[in-house]
Amino acid sequence: MNREQYLKNLSVPEGKIDVVLDTDAYNEIDDQFAIGYMLRNTQKFNIKGICAAPFLNGKSTCASDGMEKSYNEIRKLLSLAEMNDLESRVFKGSEEFLKDEKTAVRSEAADFMAALADDYSPEKPLYIVAIGAITNVASALLKNPQMTENCVVVWLGGHGVHMPLAASEFNMKQDIAAARVVFGCGIPLVQLPCGGVVDHFLTSKYELEHWLTGKNPLCDYLYNNTVQEADSYAAGKPWTRVIWDVTAVAWLLNENSKFMAERLIPSPIPEYDGHYAFDSSRHLIKYVYNINRDSLFEDLFNKLGEKG
């Protein structure tokens, strides 16, 4: 695509858009909020698919186990939101992370995204929101390089460029090879950095209780799941939680910069030692550098509290 179209595709889209969500839904308590937020914004999103991403931490025995648990969590959330009609659009993702930067990991999710992308164009792109390790998306790109023309990727991953060890953030460090594919291929990319930016998107038990409890089954689940997780390490103590992943969905709703501020920067280069390298001649990406916490939580809580 030409430069004018490329920069347009790095701008918040107008009107209703087709979107795929790629999520490690069981990894944390925030993916569930992001999924719910997307499901409740039907006036903006035509959800083409929800893909389960791999993860490995204390909640999974291996990347494959994390992906399977995320797949089941996605289906649970669709049931709670009374949107079971979307179950046929849920896809299992990669069972392992990339072994190198040239070889795709085969999965339903990667095959689905690679094939779907051919239905789009630079003038009418497919939006892919990724909120976990970016293995599925990188694999799809390796399978179908034309995605760089036909898609836009919005990813919550990495830390702020001003921070040390910025490439050591959880989503990014699990699959640096995948991150290097996505940051290096030239696809229009919007980065929501975690440390130093999105970590300001905090909420507390009492705020969640006020805005969510008793509204609907999805809201009750989000509240109980978050409190249970926090009480597992901070019972009887004050705590807050960052609802990280909501911000990636919210970028697509960020008309007039109401939820966040952004700028163009040359695409950073994630390195295997946990740092970024920088080259001012690289292609531009959109980089979010500030979150309007109160404005976004107001919209999130109001949307989640709707009956469906």
Where are these regions (language model features)?
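N-terminal acidic, glycine/proline-rich low-complexity segments
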Residues: 1-308
